[in-house]
Amino acid sequence: RVPMGIGKVGGYASNGSGDIFIAFSTANEGVFSRKGNRTIEMVPNDQMSGLFLATVQAVEEAIVNVLVAAETMEGVNGNTVYALPHDRLKQLLVKYNRMKK
């Protein structure tokens, strides 16, 4: 669901974008054992939508937080990257229904 959150703020996984996603499993202990039968507990698939939505929203918010936290800085060979003007970012988020007025 991470790519969906990226897509909500305009990302489209362009060639060379370098997107990397890491996921952690909460699988039942011993579930991957190759010996004997195992009993597992799981949430029914139809009840996972809330978790999926929360993941998309968390990724979207994390990206916006990074945009707001960015500061103007100078790098190698005098290359300067500029912080985004917060008022303009807010305007864009409102315009594209990503934020309420």
Where are these regions (language model features)?
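A structural signal for small-residue-enriched, beta-sheet-centric alpha/beta enzyme cores
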Residues: R1-K101
